[in-house]
A protein has these predicted regions:
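Class I SAM-dependent methyltransferase Rossmann-like catalytic core
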Residues: 106, 189-197
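Conserved hydrophobic/aromatic pocket- or pore-lining residues that grip, position, or stack substrates
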Residues: 120, 144, 198, 206, ...
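Class I Rossmann-like S-adenosyl-L-methionine
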Residues: 1-187
C-alpha cells in the first residue's frame, strides 16, 4: 500500500493501474484482503488534502511521510495501530483533534484544492455548492439498466436474488434496478448474456427524453 501511494502521489501514476498492479502482487490474498487494499488506497487518494493537512507533511512524499498519512487514515477509521516503528510516535489524540478542527472548513472537510472551492462558490453560490460538494463524496449506488429486449425487471431481480444480490425498484427510473449492497455483478451469467448494463439512473432517462422512434439513426457520443 505504501509503495502504491508513493507511485500515485510522487510519480503521477493512475490510481486504478496502481491498484491493479498491487492486487497481482500476492496470489494468496483472498477477496477480503484485496478489497481492503483497494479501498485503503482509493480512500487515502480521495482524502489526500485532509490527511496531508492533519499529518503536517508536504510534497514530495518520502516513505516516512506516506506512513504518517497512512497513520492518520488508520486512526480516523478507528483501527488500533500495530506495534511497528512507523507508528511509535503517532499522536492519536492530536490527529482526532485536528480532524475536528479542520472539518469545520469546507475545503478540508470535503478534501478539495482551494481553486476548486473558489470556483464552486463563484459558479453556484455558497449554499448549493456546499450541498453539491457533499453529495460528490457520497459513494454512488450501483444501478443496473435492464435490457428489456432480453428480460424484464422482475425476472432479472429474481435471477439476481438467487445469487444473493438484492435489488430494488425506483418509481422515477423505469429501467433501473438498484443494488442494496455493492456486488461484482460483472461476474454473473446475467451480465454475460446481456440482460443488463451498469449505468447511473439519470443517464438512463436520456433515452426517454430523446423519444427515439423505430428507423431513426442514433449517434451515441461521449
Amino acid at each position: 500500500t505504501i509503495d502504491s501511494l508513493m507511485a500515485i502521489f510522487n510519480e503521477g501514476e493512475y490510481a486504478d493501474k496502481v491498484v491493479a498492479r498491487a492486487l497481482k502482487k500476492d496470489k494468496r490474498w483472498g477477496s477480503h484482503d484485496r478489497k481492503f487494499v483497494a479501498e485503503t488506497i482509493y480512500e487515502i487518494v480521495r482524502w489526500k488534502r485532509l490527511y496531508v493537512e492533519i499529518a503536517e507533511v508536504k510534497e514530495p512524499f518520502d516513505r516516512d511521510k506516506i506512513w504518517r498519512i497512512f497513520a492518520v487514515w488508520a486512526v480516523l477509521r478507528g483501527y488500533n495501530l500495530p506495534d511497528w516503528k512507523y507508528f511509535e510516535e503517532t499522536p492519536v489524540r492530536r490527529i482526532k483533534g485536528k480532524f475536528d478542527e479542520l472539518t469545520k472548513t469546507r475545503k478540508f472537510k470535503e478534501s478539495i484544492p482551494d481553486w476548486m472551492d473558489e470556483l464552486g462558490v463563484k459558479e453556484l453560490g455558497e449554499e448549493i455548492w456546499t450541498k453539491e460538494l457533499a453529495a460528490q463524496n457520497d459513494q454512488a449506488k450501483v444501478i443496473l439498466r435492464v435490457n428489456k429486449l432480453k428480460t424484464t425487471k422482475e425476472k432479472l431481480r429474481a435471477l439476481l436474488m438467487d445469487l444473493n444480490i438484492e435489488t430494488e425498484f425506483h418509481n422515477d427510473y423505469p429501467d433501473a434496478l438498484i443494488l442494496t449492497e455493492r456486488a461484482n455483478v460483472f461476474l454473473t451469467d446475467a451480465f454475460k448474456e446481456g440482460f443488463f448494463e451498469v449505468q447511473d439512473a439519470s443517464s438512463q432517462l436520456v433515452a426517454y427524453f430523446l423519444d427515439v422512434k423505430p428507423g431513426m439513426r442514433v449517434v451515441d457520443t461521449c
